[in-house]
């Protein structure tokens, strides 16, 4: 059987942190594993949206940079050598007559005995700055993602938004940029209280309640933004080198909605085994929901072994759901 027709034990749809840990855990169970990821790299939103940000609620890490966590998860699963298919968005999943699954992507067809979906919030894209002329500066010095903090060294940066991402980025940019301003349409920020306290103590210029009403540039790059006071008459123009927009993201399940799974809003319903309404398909992480669900990376790390162990039992009912402890496996 060649690679094109190989039937894997477990195929993981989604290569974010929970998917990577699921791949490691499935490897510990001696499963053959494939990861299918729609993005060009592993790591999901951690790598794509905020690789430089620090995460504070991962067990065992007082603080860990998002990309560092992803790198560690990749290193952790490497001994089991899972097959990785990048830039492949899954279009459909169909159960075959023999009980295996056919997974069709935009590039290829894959086969698996069981599936674990770890697709996070599904497909996502940023809410864009809805102003004339803004689009021509996207990818130049209007940014929706930050992959390298050092590129802003010594530059005048404005951040627009009032949530955690906006405040966190402003605080991180303060360390490298020559000046940072944060613009929010309300007086109060929605970010975590601790972050807002740090913002108020920082050297960052806070512009509230203001909204950007005009972007000005020379065609090659943005040079100024005009701000207007909300429900007021004050307006001002800022000279900047970079404009970072943090209006949040619009997510969608996309084709997952058509796979025949039982859904609740934009989440897949699972039982205590992390099993979906289709036997053999399991979920872990933010993509799934159940009574009392809390959407955290740490929660997904706990759900992944449950999904994998029950998937192994589905493949072979003689297999124990409760495995040996890892300390025994690696001695």
Swiss-Prot record:
It comes from the Bacteria. FAD binds at residues 37, 45, 50, 90, 124, 286, 327. It catalyses: 2 reduced [2Fe-2S]-[ferredoxin] + NADP(+) + H(+) = 2 oxidized [2Fe-2S]-[ferredoxin] + NADPH. Binds 1 FAD per subunit. Keywords: FAD, Flavoprotein, NADP, Oxidoreductase. The keyword Nucleus does not apply. Pfam families: Pyr_redox_2. GO terms for molecular function: ferredoxin-NADP+ reductase activity; flavin adenine dinucleotide binding; NADP binding. Its cofactor is FAD. Its EC number is 1.18.1.2. It is an enzyme of class 1 (oxidoreductase). Homodimer. Belongs to the ferredoxin--NADP reductase type 2 family. PANTHER family: THIOREDOXIN REDUCTASE 1-RELATED-RELATED. This is Ferredoxin--NADP reductase 2. The lineage of its organism: Bacteria, Bacillati, Bacillota, Bacilli, Bacillales.
